[in-house]
A protein has these predicted regions:
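GIY-YIG nuclease catalytic motif and its immediate N-terminal context
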Residues: 1-43, 50-53, 57-67, 71-72, ...
Length: 84
């Protein structure tokens, strides 16, 4: 079963949100429906980056790696980088 690490960008204030999920489309829909408290006031959101992982553990580790950078510049470089 695949898991995804994703980055959303708010169309309201350009902030980024980083998360992981097993069902990417459903999760994005939940964010845009206001069913996630942190992202609700910043709706709407668009998907700007995603990575597929083979298991939950590796997706969670990657999510943590991205979040611990706490750098908008790093996120924007990641978004612009070619996928392999």
């Amino acid at each position: 079963m695949s898991y995804y690490v994703y980055i959303l960008q708010s169309l309201k204030d350009k902030t980024y949100y980083i998360g992981s999920t097993q069902d990417l489309n459903s999760r994005i829909e939940r964010h845009n429906q206001g069913r996630v408290s942190y992202t609700k006031p910043r709706r709407p959101w668009k998907l700007v980056y995603s990575e597929e992982h083979q298991d939950r553990s590796s997706a969670a580790k990657r999510e943590y790696e991205i979040k611990k950078r706490k750098s908008r510049e790093f996120i924007e470089i990641l978004i612009k980088s070619p996928r392999m």
